[in-house]
């Protein structure tokens, strides 16, 4: 049983805790919040004994083996480093950090302290994503890939009203590519590895983050186009095209439905049932990595390549974070 703590008390933290408990491999033993009242309110639903308003105190506690980090993006690196250096296993929400330098430093820290560092990118852990990977040979020679995630942000009106929510604030290492565009990018890396080159364009808001963008990656015989937006909705599915047919994926981040369309023939539904809480699978994988002490697991390479591409995409589109000027 992995005794774990959480940083953050929002909806995604609650969903992860429920998934972790559903797996039967975890027990929530500590909650951190800047507000003791907020920590207590969250803890009441899960019978948690240890509450903290100090990250340092929680890192020094002997009540936890692992921590789930769901704080703003800009805080991921410093919090991850703190717990890794105290030999606490870390599962951190995507993106793992603000840039490649931070990701490299975090991976080095995990190896130095011989603990597991895991980026919580749930898509790659889903049964239908594994099915998608296994189905790739069906399309024959790969030619074109289109991954799409465009969703009008519930916080965009607040931005238009003159507020500066975290979602559109570069101080929090945020924006479209770092948020929902990440699912498209990391999915491509998980399936196809590192591209030969990347070209990116984006529309920037006055705050300095990207509102929407397009990324084109060259893999030689085939190309991958990523479309992302936080200021518009899209009803288009994602698609992997080959000379023998195409794979169609509805809602890529959740892999809700996967179909194969042979060239000149009818669509075939390949979809497998998935748990209603799609965070279950990443919770199970992280537990396996911790139980088997797999510090150098394959996910680290995907995280590093994704961070490298994110950093280059932001360089090309002119999105700059305060973290980019910090020397590590």
Curated annotation (Swiss-Prot):
Enzyme Commission designation: 1.-.-.-
Keywords: Oxidoreductase
Superkingdom, taxonomy of origin: Bacteria
Class in the EC hierarchy, top level: oxidoreductase
Keyword Magnesium: no
Gene Ontology molecular function, alphabetical: nucleotide binding; oxidoreductase activity
Gene3D superfamilies found in the cross-reference section: Dihydrodipicolinate Reductase, domain 2, NAD(P)-binding Rossmann-like Domain
Annotated signal peptide: none
Family: Belongs to the Gfo/Idh/MocA family.
The protein's name: Uncharacterized oxidoreductase YgjR
